[in-house]
């Protein structure tokens, strides 16, 4: 927005600091440091630098290192000791968390049990399992029906679409800085796009849907995040046409709802009507 260019730089610098200090961008400082959020930082860096009148390459190199480090937080299954985002589909990631057992039990007792009408007297191990999935949702839309309460069992459309764009941005940044020609990153992005299409595209629905790798099926809940492959430009023309054709399922008087409408009561933060 006009007049907010300096604030944009401040926001990017804040995220650089977070990544340098913690190895990732937390959901919030302090209480939210046991999970991250859907990655947009890489695109923020490129957007800011492209519009900056003074091209500070020293700053860009520092920003590039932070973008690469955050990318590895999401994708490095061997070296990431903070959080496990691996899935059975090599090359596609999931949301997660790195909270401790005591915090998860407390989260179940104080938040989830009342909100979702869950049983009080269940083993601590079950509380930890349920709370872990729900806490992982904080890395995306917070509580939402897309994952059936099993967030870490799904390969999400939004996360992997954004990681595709990170690979494109990292290639661009390396070309700007003279590190490489960026082709290796282009190949990574192309590979990810092919995997997203293979596992997350539903020809039956004409939409991109989160993929349940445990039960080997798509989520039964359609979400407006289906547009993200269009936004980043890797959806085919045929896919784009079908998605646009199906977008009315998200229409509401106030704009687009996050998830398709359901006959079930809305207990999530982002169900239909949100």
Describe each PLM feature range.
Residues 20, 50, 72, 76-79, ...:
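Sec-exported extracytoplasmic/periplasmic mature domains
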Residues 4-15, 55-75, 166, 177-196, ...:
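Extended, well-ordered alpha-helical scaffold segments
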Residues 32-43, 62-66, 154-166, 220-224, ...:
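Aromatic- and histidine-enriched alpha-helix N-cap/loop-to-helix transition segments
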Residues 18-63:
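Aromatic/His-enriched, Gly/Pro-containing loop or helix-boundary segments
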Residues 152-179, 185, 191-194, 273-274:
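Long, repeat-rich segments with strong aromatic
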Residues 34, 67-87:
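Extracytoplasmic mature domains of secreted/periplasmic and thylakoid-lumen proteins
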Residues 8-28, 84-157, 191-274:
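Extended glycan-interaction surfaces of carbohydrate-active proteins
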Residues 1-5, 40-55, 161-180, 228-238:
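Well-ordered alpha-helical scaffold segments within catalytic/enzyme domains
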